[in-house]
Amino acid sequence: MKNFIKSFRLTLVFCVFFSVCYILVLWIFAQFAGPNSGNAEVVELNGKVVGAANVGQSFTEDIYFWGRPSCAGDGYDATSSAGSNKGPTNAEYLAEVEARIDTFLKHHPYLSRKEVPAEMVTASGSGLDPDITPDCAYVQVQRVAKARGMSEETVKAIVDKAVEKPFMGIFGTEKVNVLKLNAALEKAK
């Protein structure tokens, strides 16, 4: 019985430590160490909040850059964030990807099938990726410039400014946040 009480006490101590203290220490660290103090980075346009930079949104109009397709619920439903778990041999998945390629080519007639970035037709693991690679952004420059009546050089310059370098220069890859890029386009009107 003596061993049981010691074990029970130790279990309670570890439960409190790992469910409260550990999380509190991580939260305090995030408040000082990370960008945005561990909180969401809110994107504003003309004084109105248009979204959070760390959660992907659906953009389907030609005047906007598009992010990766989402498999999170119906569109970009953050409450249903998850991958589809469909593999490359799944007929339903292949049909979805083919349909996405056809849609992408319809809006980008200047590209061949081989030039369509895989990232733009396959959903991410979370289904809510806020970023695309610079190459995916540059592929869309011609469409966005034409739809907005802007020069390709102007739109490309906006993309160039939106490219974020890897963290500390070595962790990760270059990326473009789609929401921030589209907000920058709106400001450039």
Swiss-Prot record:
Signal peptide: none annotated. Disulfide bonds: none annotated. The chain crosses the membrane at residues 10-30. GO terms for molecular function: ATP binding; P-type potassium transmembrane transporter activity. It is a single-pass membrane protein. Keywords: ATP-binding, Cell inner membrane, Cell membrane, Ion transport, Membrane, Nucleotide-binding, Potassium, Potassium transport, Transmembrane, Transmembrane helix, Transport. It is found in: Cell inner membrane. GO terms for cellular component: plasma membrane. It comes from the Bacteria. NCBIfam families: kdpC (TIGR00681), PRK00315.1 (NF001454), PRK14002.1 (NF010606). The system is composed of three essential subunits: KdpA, KdpB and KdpC. Part of the high-affinity ATP-driven potassium transport (or Kdp) system, which catalyzes the hydrolysis of ATP coupled with the electrogenic transport of potassium into the cytoplasm. This subunit acts as a catalytic chaperone that increases the ATP-binding affinity of the ATP-hydrolyzing subunit KdpB by the formation of a transient KdpB/KdpC/ATP ternary complex. Belongs to the KdpC family. HAMAP family: KdpC (MF_00276). PANTHER family: POTASSIUM-TRANSPORTING ATPASE C CHAIN, POTASSIUM-TRANSPORTING ATPASE KDPC SUBUNIT. This is Potassium-transporting ATPase KdpC subunit. It comes from Phocaeicola vulgatus (strain ATCC 8482 / DSM 1447 / JCM 5826 / CCUG 4940 / NBRC 14291 / NCTC 11154) (Bacteroides vulgatus). The gene is kdpC.
